[in-house]
Amino acid sequence: MVRPAPTVVGMSCTTLLIGKSASCSGATIIARNDDSGSGRYDPKRLVAVAPTDQPRHYRSALSHVEIDLPDDPCRYTIAPNVLPNRGVLAEAGASERNVAMSATETIAVNERVLAADPLVELRPAEGVPGEAGYRPETPGGIGEEDIITLVLPYVSSAREGVERLGELLERYGTYESNGVIISDVDEIWYVETIGGHHWIARRVPDDCYATIPNQLGIDDFDFSDAFGERRFFMCSADLREFIDRHHLGRAMRPAQGAGFGVAAVLQDHINPRVVFGTSTVKDHIYNTPRAWYMQRHLNPSEDWDSPAARYTPTSDDIPWCRAPENKVTVEDIDFLMSSHFEGTPFDPYGTLGTPESRHRYRPIGINRTGHMVAIELRHDVPAAAAAVMWIAFGSGPFTAVAPFYANVDDTPAYLRDTTPE
């Protein structure tokens, strides 16, 4: 039996999703910072993957899972890691079919979920083949290294992408807790993994944006839609039974301060953030302040700073999605994804507040960002020119964002051929 991994607060990435009616251009936009883990830095490059370069049999470098792939992949462009020791790690990409993905946003699920559905981790071989007690290697599931390679070149819409990813998760499992973004010119879907084999997905409403800062963030889920028309929700086939069988729906989450929060389940709706997610001191230092700052910028007329503010940097109930006050521009995205609490007492580069407050919370723009990729899928231009990848390589506060067409046969050599040196 694969033992549950300990719940940890993710140490990388910030995601901002913009529905087509919420964006200034009328396009869907998915943006994510890919941040290296503490103590390392992962440089990136930009490459076009031809169908002939796509493997037909895939083996993960990290988990050693092996998967046969379809024989009809399409061309796609990705911004993967340069260092080869951790596999492809495509991170963000768009296909010639105008489907885009960003993977992954590290999230955390609670111990109750992991006990009920443990992560599927690689178990190395033990002993010597042919001798007593030998136990062969057991591969792990799929993870950030694999997801875009296994999904993006085989789907024609965001919905198809969710379905394919869900099938892979249910069959092979996963060894880590992740959020995955899949979009097309009309829709944005956000998938969160629940334990080793379960998952939920929610569509971002067209007139809304969504903020995800390394937490399991979806705060409403409608089972009647997920098992009906699937207009806004999808999930693994046995999710409802899984929740009931392991009493997860009875979960009460510690409220901020003292006492307990409200019950998680109400008829056909659950709050996944309560049922599956975490609420810890680490979340309030590392995660919730980033959601607070993004929404503070996009809904500025609300009270965010007074003692009576509805949401504070440590609020657990900051909405997963909401309508912005004004249409969101690429400039807004660039600012937010490189931001460091400008205009607040929490800016580490600022002069407001105190030395303590300026280092209290984890900002979005940090020095271990490998790149920010915002993929804009436009509906008012020819399909061949619809996908634009806005990319900033390196630490956001000190770099500039530049646009690149994604539907290409090749990429500039100075971005394609980046070496570890």
Regions found by a protein language model. Give the residues of each.
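Accessory, solvent-exposed terminal regions and/or long lumenal/extracellular loops of proteins
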Residues: G277-P355, R362-I364
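Short, well-ordered beta-strand elements within core beta-sheets of diverse protein domains
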Residues: I148-V155
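Hydrophobic alpha-helical scaffolding
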Residues: E137-T138, V151, P363
